[in-house]
Regions:
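Acidic/histidine-rich catalytic cores of soluble enzymes
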Residues: 84-85, 114, 183-279
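Acidic-and-aromatic substrate-binding clefts and catalytic sites of carbohydrate-active enzymes
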Residues: 64-71, 87-99, 170-174, 205-210, ...
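Hydrophobic faces of well-ordered beta-strands that scaffold small-molecule active sites
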Residues: 58-64, 85-87, 111-116, 163-165, ...
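Conserved, mostly hydrophobic/aromatic
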Residues: 77, 85, 155, 255, ...
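N-terminal secretory signal peptides and thylakoid transit peptides that target proteins
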Residues: 1-17
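Acidic (Asp/Glu)-rich catalytic clusters
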Residues: 51-55, 74-79, 95-115, 152-159, ...
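Active-site acidic/histidine proton-transfer and metal-coordination neighborhood
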Residues: 13-20, 68-71, 123-225, 310
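C-terminal segment of N-terminal export signals and the immediately downstream linker at the start
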Residues: 24-65, 76
Length: 325
């Protein structure tokens, strides 16, 4: 994630995808683009949640904001020839949930998760990030717990089986009070999602893989999983995803297909780039996911706007289709 707030990126993505309309007919004909709490028990373990139900093949998707027009947004996913998506919504209400569910059914698109952020300011860097992102900051924690619960209810109304979010810079030191507070908050949210019949997913990025595994095990519920954002691990300088998958693989329920470069400035994240131009080794990671019998979605994410975003998404689709085949 770059400094730009993810919500801003997702808000622009739907409008940008409107530029894809001229290629709808070709896509329908199958013509591919030529472009390339403090009382937790630290001894408990969370059972692994499988992504292999139904043994579906690996399938591609797109992350996007739906704005106030779910039909138009989901139509873009359909016209790209993608069978799945992850969705972000700004406003959570029953009217919008009905329209989103209707659009998903109409176009036969599977929404694999609802992406949740905020409320409040989130700064995507190494200095303000620890103070503003996710459930770690005390000042915004209660409001965000309430917001994620509301999002869980919204997802249930839409028939979406998972809710995911950045939980923040989870402390490396499990002995500090803020770690125990964060685990308690995560347990409360994961428990709420479980009662709604959903999985709760952690988006990788701000924490090291072993810290995330520790938090999952300390929360101790069986509906937790990981949305494995391949580039974020690099952008935050936390791990090479090729190595991280050995720690996180059993928990992976979703993938963000995104590329990036390592940080060169210790104050700023690394740079997100088009797939194939960064440091993510997609062939090795996809091969390892297959060995682990992963059967979830591989969701394309490109954090820019304008015509270049469209070109990069189309190229990523062609490239990834070859790898997941």
């Amino acid at each position: 994630m770059t400094k730009r707030n993810r919500r801003t990126f997702l808000q622009t993505s739907t409008a940008v995808l409107a530029a894809l309309s001229p290629v709808r007919a070709a896509l329908r004909r199958g013509v591919a683009s030529e472009s390339f709490a403090s009382n937790f028990d630290t001894t408990q373990s969370a059972p692994t949640v499988s992504s292999n139900e139904g043994k579906k093949p690996l399938r591609l998707g797109l992350i996007l904001g739906i704005g106030r027009d779910p039909n138009d947004a989901i139509a873009k996913v359909h016209d790209l020839g993608l069978p799945t998506c992850q969705v972000f919504v700004d406003e959570i209400d029953s009217v919008l949930s009905g329209r989103l569910r209707e659009a998903l059914n109409k176009y036969q698109i599977e929404a694999t998760s609802l992406v949740v952020g905020g409320p409040g300011r989130e700064a995507w860097d190494f200095y303000e990030g620890p103070l503003t992102i996710g459930l770690v900051p005390r000042e915004t924690r209660e409001a965000r717990i309430a917001h994620i619960k509301k999002a869980s209810d919204f997802a249930k109304q839409c028939g979406i089986a998972a809710v995911q979010t950045h939980c923040g810079f989870i402390p490396e030191n499990p002995n500090v009070p803020v770690y125990k507070e964060t685990v308690a908050a995560l347990r409360e949210i994961a428990g709420y999602c479980k009662r709604n019949g959903q999985n709760f997913r952690y988006e990788t990025g701000q924490e090291t893989p072993i810290t995330l595994v520790r938090a999952i095990q300390d929360v101790g519920l069986d509906n937790q999983g990981v949305n494995f954002d391949l580039a974020n691990l690099i952008l935050y300088g936390k791990a090479n995803p090729v190595d991280a998958i050995e720690l996180l693989g059993q928990y992976v329920q979703g993938i963000h297909a995104k590329d990036g470069l390592w940080p060169t400035n210790p104050r700023q994240l690394g740079q997100e780039v088009a797939i194939g131009k960064g440091k993510v080794d997609f062939p090795r990671i996809i091969a390892r996911l297959k060995e682990l019998n992963y059967r979830g979605a591989v969701t394309i994410e490109r954090e820019i706007s304008g015509p270049q975003q469209v070109e990069d998404v189309r190229a990523a689709k062609v490239y990834l289709e070859k790898l997941i085949a």
